[in-house]
């Protein structure tokens, strides 16, 4: 109980708005670390690391790993700036992240390696529709949306 209270007080003491800039380490297709800050990319949901999907030819692949690799390629050692003002129940900063002027969250969805997370935001629905029409990333084959896969 004391641990939870301490954690809650720590989270409440954090600034309401946080900009974090630096080199990022990719955890998965929608989570990164910059310095001591764990960041969940706002408005998108990428496959979980152990999640599989199928290619257009029916071959099973680790789509969570592919989403992580896609985010790593987008970042490629560049400085990343993340802007956010909320934290999730795990204490992660919820943020839109940029390489220069480019929205990484949008790029992940536009390339088809993440979905618009409509439960929390409608910001990336157009990007998702474009990826779907162009059959990019996950849209080349068959997959279960990450939020459904987690509930199995």
Regions found by a protein language model. Name each.
Residues 2-4, 12-152:
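Small beta-barrel nucleic-acid-binding modules, primarily SNase/OB-fold domains
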């Amino acid at each position: 109980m004391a641990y939870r209270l301490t954690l809650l007080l720590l989270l409440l003491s954090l600034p309401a708005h946080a900009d974090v800039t630096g080199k990022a380490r990719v955890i998965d297709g929608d989570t990164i670390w910059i310095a001591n800050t764990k960041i969940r990319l706002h408005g998108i949901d990428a496959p979980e690391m152990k999640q599989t999907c199928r290619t257009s030819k029916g071959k099973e692949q680790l789509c969570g790993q592919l989403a992580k690799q896609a985010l790593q390629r987008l970042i490629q050692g560049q400085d990343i700036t993340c802007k956010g003002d909320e934290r999730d129940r795990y204490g992660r900063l919820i943020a839109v992240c940029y390489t220069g002027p480019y929205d990484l969250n949008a790029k992940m969805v536009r390339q088809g390696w993440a979905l618009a997370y409509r439960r929390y935001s409608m910001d990336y629905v157009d990007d998702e529709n474009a990826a779907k029409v162009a059959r990019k990333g996950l849209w080349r084959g068959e997959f279960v949306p990450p939020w459904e896969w987690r509930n199995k």
